[in-house]
Amino acid sequence: MKPVKPPRINGRVPVLSAQEAVNYIPDEATLCVLGAGGGILEATTLITALADKYKQTQTPRNLSIISPTGLGDRADRGISPLAQEGLVKWALCGHWGQSPRISDLAEQNKIIAYNYPQGVLTQTLRAAAAHQPGIISDIGIGTFVDPRQQGGKLNEVTKEDLIKLVEFDNKEYLYYKAIAPDIAFIRATTCDSEGYATFEDEVMYLDALVIAQAVHNNGGIVMMQVQKMVKKATLHPKSVRIPGYLVDIVVVDPDQSQLYGGAPVNRFISGDFTLDDSTKLSLPLNQRKLVARRALFEMRKGAVGNVGVGIADGIGLVAREEGCADDFILTVETGPIGGITSQGIAFGANVNTRAILDMTSQFDFYHGGGLDVCYLSFAEVDQHGNVGVHKFNGKIMGTGGFIDISATSKKIIFCGTLTAGSLKTEIADGKLNIVQEGRVKKFIRELPEITFSGKIALERGLDVRYITERAVFTLKEDGLHLIEIAPGVDLQKDILDKMDFTPVISPELKLMDERLFIDAAMGFVLPEAAH
């Protein structure tokens, strides 16, 4: 049953309280939620109102949730408040770990749970807006979203196949079914009385327009939270990102903040002010910085790269310290291009950004092989060079943009530590000392589920590295090759004994560059790109 929209009077968009708005959500509706981690573009007031209504009335029931980007704080925010039995029956997310209470329901087999790659998911919403049945892509071949593996299903109660293997001109592709949502929760900064909306205080745009079009064109209700309203036709047309005819309900929250817990607006993050970054940084020399330093060695002048969340996100700061940050461009999948990369849950809230694209377009660029290099953090690696991040230690994290980015980037740099669980190291006198070994081995014999396929990467001619604090590996046809080790570590005791398989030891095995282990600027000069 399609939801019933409130009427417009004299062209004015209905302005309701959040509590009134969520009364328009019927049982069995499919709700698509905009937002990224740390409160970016999150319609918190609407989410809270829906969660509270269900607690009090046990309605609406059996919703399906679509969330392209991981929103939340890795605890109780984001869509975690919606994780109530009976409220949600089904979920399709690009990333799960930012809202872990939803992940808990999936892990306990209490909801049907799917994971599409984040970029693919936003593209299927664009397809839904155009009334196309889905998208066809080679992104995800050989990974857990491939129907020959798990088909993107995250638990035992998830049975229906949403992803199919198809073939055109003797080449394999995946067909991803587009799910048309009935309700949208989106957010902007300002709208006029007819619903035309601007994003001047926001960090980025994500796929707000795509979601609104998908819901509108399928007869649903677009609910938009804003911080303020203005007179109709007074917003600059080039600033308007959402046309008013897409919006059915507006909820005004004058206390809406740009991110969780901060001032209402940080003008550096919104792009209005430029931060003076001329002062040289000096980051503490630890294992995180060590990995980022070694990763920087894989960058080339003029390259366009992507940086992911986790230990990999230090590369931009190390490049600033070395004075070469302006010699290449780092992008984030949610839309930012250039600037200083943020860290933590509000990943993508960059400053000094050069441009901001909508997320769907950013992924089009990635899928087509536009990236020269990407820097991604890994959870586990197996003997075939496969990487796992979407599910480990029994926890569902989801892929985010990991599959989209790593499938086609010309050079792929995976960053992490060799072991996990209370690993402690110190760097002194140009050497690495393992003070306390991690309890958990991260290099295992076989991954139970694959987020990155080493086999497919080799078939596509991609260059793959795995950089840790004590060892560097590269991927070849016969598996992982150990090519560098840190000064101060023992090859057998500190590396081989801490892996569940034995890599090929390169005959040219060498020590990692000694400059990495000295607590001073390395004097690193970016190499020219090969032509």
Curated annotation (Swiss-Prot):
Disulfide bonds: none annotated. It is an enzyme of class 2 (transferase). It comes from the Bacteria. The keyword Transferase applies. Its EC number is 2.8.3.8. GO terms for molecular function: acetate CoA-transferase activity. It catalyses: an acyl-CoA + acetate = a carboxylate + acetyl-CoA. The keyword Transferase applies. InterPro entries: 3-oxoacid_CoA-transferase (IPR014388), CoA_trans_fam_I (IPR004165), NagB/RpiA_transferase-like (IPR037171). It holds the Pfam family CoA_trans. Keywords: Transferase. The active site is at E333. GO terms for biological process: ketone body catabolic process; protein homotetramerization; short-chain fatty acid metabolic process. Belongs to the 3-oxoacid CoA-transferase family. CoA transferase having broad substrate specificity for short-chain acyl-CoA thioesters with the activity decreasing when the length of the carboxylic acid chain exceeds four carbons. Exhibits high activity with acetoacetyl-CoA, propionyl-CoA, crotonoyl-CoA or butyryl-CoA as donors, with acetate as an acceptor. When acetyl-CoA is used as the donor, propionate, acetoacetate, butyrate, isobutyrate, and 4-hydroxybutyrate can be utilized as acceptors but not isovalerate. May play a role in short-chain fatty acid metabolism in E.coli. Formation of the covalent enzyme-CoA thioester intermediate proceeds via an unstable anhydride species formed between the carboxylate group of the catalytic glutamate of the enzyme and the carbonyl carbon of the thioester linkage of the substrate. Homotetramer; dimer of dimers. This is Acetate CoA-transferase YdiF. It comes from Escherichia coli O157:H7. The gene is ydiF.
